């Protein structure tokens, strides 16, 4: 074998052996974050077994550092930012930019709530054929209106509820004039015209559309921020039962509800909380937002769950770990209880996303009573290591013991609680 080839092979073998020996340290080095966020008075740990020193890059008042054998603990002291510098044998090897944010705590929920939503305008949920003198017709369908469209104006007048519609239809029908409609379809606004037809059976004019201006259901309160009274619930969007499209909210309200029974979930057939609430019940908060991360608004007064009424810290998605956790929810009457779960997997997210973790119900009593995650449990707060980390959102249809959760970070943002305010301003 030529000498130059022998040297090349030897070099390759040497590099390979070194790579194997350095594999774990290299992985741990790469796992050290380049940026991290921590709240004032709270501590975050960076897991590493590397023999490195860690210290602030300057006489910083933003945070303190403590090195343990297998982790580096960073504790926020004062909002601001600084750098954490790692050195090996006196040589700097990496830096982490640390953002210390103003302290934030929320009161976890768990209460069963009744939800009443009022849409912007009236929602078209379907069509029907009118028996006219010329046969069956649907003027709305002929005009190009689609299920899921929202009628927001008729003849230039704002439409807010179903009762607003009938006078315009009857007037246009009697005069034989067309109705000028302004409809909202997704993000578009579309103008169209239609002429009401007389129903031969009833003698009234119709437009051949099924419409709705409100929706109701139940869910679970996730949290509220005690200073602003802003809250978040459900953890997922509310969609219309017929069109399956998200309801565009004009306003709405939440009330207390009572769980009367549970339909237990089985494989392929998710269960459900059966609950009741009366329209006469006192409104406990308003709804001003219906988003992929839940419903949001402001409470009219503080509400208690009588199990964890003290404000708790919140966790960033990077802090959530695989392992034991708890949820707060109601399975009987209005009593909030704590149940054991397991975080099976979690995804540290840089941008808002609805499915941030997979969880599994492990509590024997909850499994016995419900079979796992059931409809109406959406929004149940998840607590891990004394912090609110997220909310239950979806159940796996073929395995009701498991489902998805959303990180609390994104629900707080949707609620209008700017946890990054000082960070953005710096």
Curated annotation (Swiss-Prot):
SMART domains linked to this entry: PDZ
Region listing for PDZ binding, in residue ranges: 393-395
Main location: membrane
Domain PDZ: 101-187
One Pfam family here: PDZ_6
Modulation of this protein's activity: The zymogen is inhibited from undergoing autoactivation by BofC. The protease is inactivated by proteolytic cleavage.
Residue ranges constituting the Peptidase S55 domain according to the UniProt record: 188-426
UniProt keywords, alphabetically: Hydrolase, Protease, Serine protease, Signal, Sporulation, Zymogen
GO molecular function: serine-type peptidase activity
Reactions accelerated catalytically: Self-cleaves 52-Val-|-Asn-53, 62-Ala-|-Phe-63 and 74-Val-|-Thr-75 at the N-terminus of SpoIVB
Record-listed E.C. numbers: 3.4.21.116
Propiece span(s): 29-52
Active site: 236, 363, 378
Signal peptide residues on this chain, from the entry's feature table: 1-28
Location(s), subcellular: Forespore intermembrane space
Taxonomy, superkingdom: Bacteria
One Gene Ontology biological process: proteolysis
Stated consequence of mutating residue 378 to A/K: Inhibits autoproteolysis of protein and spore formation
InterPro entries the UniProt entry points to: PDZ (IPR001478), PDZ_6 (IPR041489), PDZ_sf (IPR036034), Peptidase_S1_PA (IPR009003), Peptidase_S55 (IPR008763), SpoIVB (IPR014219)
Subunit (UniProt): The PDZ domain mediates interaction with another SpoIVB protein during transactivation. Also mediates interaction with BofA during cleavage of SpoIVFA.
Main function: Plays a central role in the sigma-K checkpoint which coordinates gene expression during the later stages of spore formation. The protease is activated by trans cleavage of the zymogen precursor producing SpoIVB-45 kDa. This undergoes further trimming by cis cleavage to form SpoIVB-43 kDa and SpoIVB-42 kDa. The protease then cleaves the C-terminus of the SpoIVFA metalloprotease activating the latter.
NCBIfam families: spore_IV_B
Protein name per the record: SpoIVB peptidase
């Amino acid at each position: 074998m030529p000498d130059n080839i022998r040297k090349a092979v030897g070099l390759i073998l040497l590099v390979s052996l070194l790579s194997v020996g350095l594999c774990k340290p290299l992985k741990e080095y790469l796992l050290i974050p380049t940026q991290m966020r921590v709240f004032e008075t709270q501590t975050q740990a960076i897991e590493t077994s590397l023999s490195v020193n860690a210290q602030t890059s300057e006489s910083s008042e933003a945070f303190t550092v403590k090195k343990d054998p297998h982790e580096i603990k960073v504790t926020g002291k004062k909002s601001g930012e600084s750098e954490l510098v790692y050195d090996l044998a006196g040589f700097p090897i990496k830096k982490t930019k640390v953002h210390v944010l103003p302290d934030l705590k929320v009161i976890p929920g768990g209460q069963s709530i009744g939800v009443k939503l009022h849409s912007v305008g009236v929602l078209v949920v379907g069509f029907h054929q009118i028996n006219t003198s010329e046969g069956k017709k649907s003027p709305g369908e002929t005009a190009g209106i689609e299920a899921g469209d929202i009628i927001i104006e008729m003849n230039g007048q704002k439409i807010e509820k179903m009762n607003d519609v009938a006078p315009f239809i009857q007037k246009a029908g009697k005069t034989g004039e067309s109705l000028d409609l302004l409809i909202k379809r997704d993000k578009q606004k579309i103008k169209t015209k239609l002429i009401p037809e007389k129903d031969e059976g009833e003698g009234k004019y119709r437009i051949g559309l099924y419409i709705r201006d409100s929706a109701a259901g139940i869910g679970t309160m996730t949290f509220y921020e005690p200073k602003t009274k802003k809250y978040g619930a459900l953890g997922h969007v509310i969609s219309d039962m017929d069109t399956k499209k998200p309801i565009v909210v004009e306003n709405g309200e939440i009330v207390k509800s009572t769980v009367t029974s549970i339909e237990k979930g089985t494989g392929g057939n998710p269960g459900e909380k059966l609950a009741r609430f009366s329209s006469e019940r006192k409104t406990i908060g308003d709804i001003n937002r219906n988003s992929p991360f839940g419903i949001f608004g402001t409470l009219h007064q503080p509400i208690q769950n009588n199990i964890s009424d003290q404000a708790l810290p919140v966790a960033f998605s990077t802090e959530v770990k695989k392992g034991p956790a708890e949820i707060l929810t109601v399975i009987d009457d209005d009593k909030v209880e704590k149940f054991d779960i397991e975080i099976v997997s979690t995804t540290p997210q840089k941008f808002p996303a609805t499915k941030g973790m997979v969880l599994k119900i492990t509590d024997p009593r909850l499994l016995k009573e419900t079979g796992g995650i059931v409809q109406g449990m959406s929004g149940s707060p998840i607590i891990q290591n004394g912090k609110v980390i997220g909310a239950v959102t979806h159940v796996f249809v073929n395995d009701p013991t498991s489902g998805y959760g959303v990180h609390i970070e994104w629900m707080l943002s949707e609620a209008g609680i700017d946890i990054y305010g000082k960070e953005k301003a710096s």
